[in-house]
């Protein structure tokens, strides 16, 4: 019988001396590192365990070691300029025999931890045609694996049944079932012995004990004995010594504020306590140099009941609630085990909890500048927008962690020929770190990690000189509930989302814009009188929109870097049911007019609709993390109901642009294979298809794939990434939308084009591809993309590379495309 004691992290390989930098210069350069003989473990995993590496190659082309060349060029230049090149390059990968020996030992230890006790590792250095170039070849003979046969827990007999069940039934091993003769022993099938997996199991048992009241348990409380009943299998016995079971005792909040008046107050913190064990813990607070903080914030944040059994999970939930308010810069929650008390000699122990926090400055004022592609007011061309904003924030306006923010912004946009638009906007918002009545019960029903309520108002006015349009005012109001189910899964419920828009026209509106959108009226363009009227209404009539929306989001990716993880989002909304009900029951009983009264005698149009969409994004790191494969798939459908047969303009879908299908400009793609009329032509479509889809669509499908590779490190304090991408997608009219009329031909009668048809949709997908550059600072990413059309579904551009490599699309933006 072989007995091993597992009480620490996996064993480390014994290190041997390596060469100094000066002595490395006399060694040959490593051309390639090979690993062979590994059948059970992937090569990528083994490469992560060794330090002997060759220089990176561009696109894996032999000899194309761009980063080494950059480094050597810096050596040649010297000085500060040379230092900059060396910092962005990669030093030559010289052979280090001591490092190779250490890698052999690392691989041997790694294989032993993976259950291959008899694995043999060797390394050969093979000279190439050039004497200064070598290949390092690691040869692996894995030998037979060792399997884990059983896992027995000792010391669980005195634990509460719920804690026992959690430990036994939630093992990290997939094929583990309790044996008949011993309920605390698991029979494990088809599981290779892995030391890291056993350590993970030990950590899981620790969590179960700490969440079951055993606050003093540590890693030393669990020891694993490994037995070898057969040469190819192990039995593991975990001895658990949980110690004493604790309850939450007295709770002391200590709050430090940013003021310097040295004031101290001790308000009452009123929370329920559990006195069933013969002791009623107290909850107290000491607040220094902070005049605004209310004890109600502390009461809501407390996620455990004093007097109940100790749970580390509930303690961490309290910390998350405190930090989620945004009122604190620092939080620290500590169980005071040394001060634990037992009110009765034979009674249970109570552990006091010390909660220390530090509040942030309440008032903050910040200015910002920003660049954007205008999408607010019915664009017809890609525009570069520049703006300035000013934001005031009060981090604790009502004393209970409520955050007030007032943002104002002004922006202008240009198409490089002239100033095309001016926009002013303001948005006050109030974020509450709790759910308002009557939604507070959702927190208890779903056992949420964190909750917020956001109330916001918005106002916007804008002028579009190129379209001869202006928006006198667009007013909005929103009540949103934010529910965090886990750290990565959240729900957003827009209980109220109201907008009132009052557009107006300027001189020459008809000539510059309307005639092109509606067509010449000769049987082409938009011929349906209902849709013609609705298009005019989009740009000339006041409108009212309301929506009830639910969004479910799972996000594990960093929102800025997006190097790994995912963002999965699904949303469904029903719109304008409120004005529909008011129209039917209050304003025109028994009939529908699709209008409701507005201000000053105006009538407001509304269009009921349903809308659902799915947005899936996945980020896969490649190699050693220098590259990322980004994938995105999007699908959305909007469907009108009631009298109107189109959805509101701002709830339609558009395709094309820097974050969509990049071979086209902003909103230039679709609907379907149709092409809108070009300005000034009246009868002919644009020759290059560069006319925005003003109508939008009811159905949208898109897919994107992008490879991002870091090519330069820390040049101008930023990482430089080269990207290659392929995008595809389009938008279509839905079944109720009248669509665009096409003239009759000898082969087919006139019909509405732009409609979604399953048989023709694949041929109507636009495809674009290109290269891009990302300049990534720590908190800021600049994006440049150059894209070409691979397949244009419009009638005049139905060939692949019809224009060769002429007329590419250049997109500039902030942040990654997706």
What do these predicted regions represent?
Residues 272, 281-288, 370-381, 393, ...:
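C-terminal outer-membrane beta-barrel translocator/porin domains of Gram-negative envelope proteins
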Residues 1-5:
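Bacterial N-terminal signal peptides
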Residues 719-722, 729, 734, 770, ...:
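Flexible, small/polar- and glycine-enriched "cap/hinge" segments at structural transition points
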Residues 304-309, 394, 746-749, 756, ...:
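C-terminal soluble interaction/assembly domains
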Residues 166-167, 172-180, 191, 291-292, ...:
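Gram-negative/organellar outer-membrane beta-barrel architecture
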Residues 129-131, 144, 244, 622-624, ...:
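A generic beta-sheet turn/junction motif
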Residues 14-373, 385, 408-416, 421, ...:
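Periplasmic polypeptide-binding modules associated with outer-membrane biogenesis and secretion
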Residues 9-13:
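Sec/Tat signal peptide C-region and signal peptidase I cleavage site
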